[in-house]
Amino acid sequence: MSLYGMMRTGVSGMNAQANRLSTVADNIANASTVGYKRAETQFSSLVLPSTAGQYNSGSVLTDVRYGISDQGGIRSTSSTTDLAIDGNGYFVVQGPGGSTYLTRAGSFVPDKNGDLVNSAGYYLLGAGADEAAGGLTVAGLNIVNVNAAALPAEGSTAGDFTVNLPSTDQAPAAGGYNHKTSLISYNDKGEKITLDVYFTKTGADEWNVSVKNAADGVEIGTTVLNFDPTTGDLVSGGNVAVNLGAYGGQTLNLNLGGSTQRAGDYTISQAVINGQAPSSIKGVDVGNDGAVVAVYENGTQKVLYRIPLANVASPDRMTVVSGNIFLPSAESGDVRLGFPQGDGMGKIMSGTLEESNADIAQELTDMIEAQRSYTANSKVFQTGFELMDVLVNLKR
């Protein structure tokens, strides 16, 4: 039985090394695959019962493990929707059948509908822009779509304009003014209306404010500012109702509260008016915190989604599926969601990709070792076969 056992063990060793060569071949083939996780063949011995004075050789068992938790290198790309994770966590993606998986392969691009999909055909899932981390569930995530609607026109209705008017200014001659500033507002079609705001000193602590349409010089709003003679703080007259109705707009409430009359130059500390022209989307950025931000032609930015990350207690125990995606299992533990840079998750890096964690030099070394071991095991089988042939021929 020992010669049969010797041959059986040799075959077992060859099969084991063949498995190792297969994983090495996979690793080498996927050395440039985004998000690929290295496979490794692990060995364990199988001991068979033996009797006193007679050894019954056993065999070797193999098991394939993946280095899912080992991060690969990160390289830069030119696409803002190429995403890599620096640290813990996995992207949550949806397959063609609607099932959800985890992955580190972040080569996402918009499809014809604007949905972000990676090279393996899995769609990136995200949470709402205002979603709280504590309320995250996989079922509550949606496919990230970057075809944001164009910003509509919005007429101006409110603004804040805060200035300092020099206390040393003198009242100008009739028809004159001391200071002038131009502000931009919008009518309901999103067309610009330039407002000229004139400040004219009319008394020791009194100023007249006149708002005119710069296009035709028509006065469309006025107020009188009164300041405290001791502190220079505004006492009354801090609101101007600017009537844009004749120009296709609404009444704009221009707030001058916080303005002062003190020594120094004429300065502006705040000048903001709401409203906007219609604007189409220019591009999409993704922040380290997972915020997917639409950038519009007029410079406006709007958060569309927040990309959560997922993790499990034992990532290396997840089931590997084609396409560099992973399926949580009972051995890996339950999925836990959180936003990047919090909840123990890493950060998302836009314009980068995580490379394969397979090292070509190490794989070639492993291949040579497996080749030598395979050859040695074949020699064991060959020797056992030759000895068996000697035994069979003893009767001749």
From Swiss-Prot:
This is Flagellar hook protein FlgE. The flagellum is required to cause a persistent disease in a murine model of infection. InterPro entries: Falgellar_hook_FlgE_sf, Flag_bb_rod_N, Flagellar_basal_body_rod_CS, Flagellar_FlgE/F/G, Flg_bb/hook_C_dom, FlgE/F/G-like, FlgE_D2, LlgE_F_G-like_D1. GO terms for biological process: bacterial-type flagellum-dependent swarming motility. It comes from Brucella melitensis biotype 1 (strain ATCC 23456 / CCUG 17765 / NCTC 10094 / 16M). It is found in: Bacterial flagellum basal body. PROSITE patterns: FLAGELLA_BB_ROD (PS00588). PANTHER family: FLAGELLAR HOOK PROTEIN FLGE, FLAGELLAR PROTEIN. The keyword Signal does not apply. Keywords: Bacterial flagellum. Pfam families: Flg_bb_rod, Flg_bbr_C, FlgE_D2, LlgE_F_G_D1. Disruption phenotype: A flgE mutant is attenuated in a murine model of infection. Four weeks after infection, the number of cfu per spleen from mice infected with the mutant is significantly lower than the number from mice infected with the wild-type. Belongs to the flagella basal body rod proteins family. The keyword Coiled coil does not apply. Induction: Expressed at the onset of the exponential phase (after 4, 8 and 12 hours of culture) but not at later time points. The lineage of its organism: Bacteria, Pseudomonadati, Pseudomonadota, Alphaproteobacteria, Hyphomicrobiales. It comes from the Bacteria. Its main location: other. GO terms for cellular component: bacterial-type flagellum basal body; bacterial-type flagellum hook; cytosol. Gene3D superfamilies: Flagellar hook protein FlgE.
